C-alpha cells in the first residue's frame, strides 16, 4: 500500500526560508485578500499569502518580492482568506460513503481536515476494517486523521459485535502513520469503575503521546463524571445543554458541540460563550454523524459554522471553533488550523464571514474546489472481498421470526417501549398497554414493532421489542444494516410479513437500507462495503437516500432525518432505552429489562 506523503515542516524549512527572504519565488501567491487571523481573532485587510511546497512561507501586505515568472498568482479580489475547516469528531461511515467519496463530498464545502473514528466498520470487520479506512484516508488530497476505535462492543455484556477490539489492537494501531489518538471512549461506566481493558487502551494511547476521545452520555455530573475525567478522556461531544458544556470545560475537557444530520446540540450549549462569556478556546465544532443527503444539499463544517453564527456566536469565534481550537486540541496547531508560516496551505476564499459561501478551497497549496465543484481526484482503495458480503442471517427469515408471545392468559400487556425523540440521540423509556391477539402481542396506534437481527455470525437470532414516535401507518417495514454501533440488522415495522421481506432483501444485496409496503419495495440504498458504505458518488447515494425519505413519509413518518434516528435505536451507550441482540437495554442502569412487564392474572 503506497500512501501519499506530505513533506514535514522541517523537510521544507530551507525552501520556506528562501521564499520568505525573497531569494526564491513562491509556487503560488494569493494576492489582495482579507487575512482571517485565528491566533489574534482579527481580520487584516490588504494581505498576500506566499505558498511553497504546499506550506505557507509568508503572510503580509505585499508578496510581490517573492513572486517569480513561474509563480501561480490567485487574485482574492478583496475576499476573506480563512483557514480550511476542521471536523473535530466524526464517523465517515455515517455518510454511507467510503473515505474517498466522503472527501469528494466535503472538500467543496471547505473541509480540509477530518478527525474520524471508524468504529462503525470496527464492529463489523475489526482491525482489518479500521486499517482499510485508515489507508484510504491517507490517499486523499486533504487531511484525514484516524482515531483508533476504543469500544467494540460499545457496552460489553449488553451486545455482541462482529469483532472485539483489544488493548493490544489499540497499541498496534498507535504505530500506524495516520493514527492521531483513541476514538470516543463510549464505555464510560467501564472507565469510571476502573475496567482494566479500558484503562489499558487509554494508557497505550497516552504513552504514545496521543489524544483520548470522550463520550460521556449521562446527565449525572457527579462522582461518576469526575472518575471518567480522571481516567483520561480529553473531549466530549455528548453534551446537550449549557451546563454540560460548562462542566466539561471547567474540568479541562474540550466541549465538542455537534451539528450533524440528526444532532442539533449547538444552540443549547453555545450560550456558555455568547451569554456566560466563558473562554471559547475550549469549544470545538464537529458533526459526529452526517448522512450523504446533508453533505450534498446543506454542507458540512461550513453548515456547522454558519449555524453557530446564527445562534449568536461572533463569526471569528465560530471560525476558531472549527480551525485553531481543533488543531490545538490534537497537538497540530503547528501543522494546521491557521494561515501562518510553516502550516499546511489549507485556505478558503469567501466573500462573507457570516453566510460563508465557499468560493475557492485550497489544500496543501493546490486548488481542490472552486464554486462548489471538486477539482482533484480522490483515490479509492481496491476494497477486498472480505469487506463485502457481510450480512449473514443463518436462514431465510419468516414472519414468525418477528412474533412476540404474550404471557399465557393475557388479553393485554404492559410493554416497555423505546420512545424516539426528534433531533436528539437520547430516547425515552416509555410504557404502553398493548393488545394480545391469538397469543401474540401487537403494536397499536403509534407503537410498532422493532427487531434486531444478528448478522455477523449467522446465529439466526432475532430480538423483538416495541418502539414509538415514527408515526408509521399501513402494512410496512424498514430494515437497515446500519445499526449503531453493533451494526446488526435493525427492522422496524407495522407488519411482520413486511419485516421479513425487508430483512431478506438486505441479505440478498449484501447490506443497506430498504423499505417495504404491501409486499413492494419502495426504496433501497445499497451499502455493499461492510453493510455500511457505498463506493458510489455521494450524489448518487444521496439521491437514493432521498427516495428512502420520501418512502418513509409515504408510510406516515414525518420525523426530521428519520432514517438516522432509525439507525440509532441499538446504540446501547446513550440513554434511555435501546435494543440489542441480547435484549432490551435500560441505559440509565446498564441492565437488560423485559419487553413485557410481569403479568398477574
Swiss-Prot record:
A GO MF term: adenine deaminase activity
Keywords: Hydrolase, Manganese
Cofactor section: Mn(2+)
Source domain of life: Bacteria
Keyword Hydrolase: yes
CDD domains reported for this sequence: AdeC
Cross-referenced InterPro entries: Adenine_deam, Adenine_deam_C, Amidohydro-rel, Metal-dep_hydrolase_composite, Metal_Hydrolase
Catalysed reaction equations from the record: adenine + H2O + H(+) = hypoxanthine + NH4(+)
Transmembrane intervals: none
GO biological process, one term: adenine catabolic process
Keyword Manganese: yes
Class of enzymatic activity (EC top level): hydrolase
Enzyme Commission designation: 3.5.4.2
Family label: Belongs to the metallo-dependent hydrolases superfamily. Adenine deaminase family.
Name used for this protein in its record: Adenine deaminase
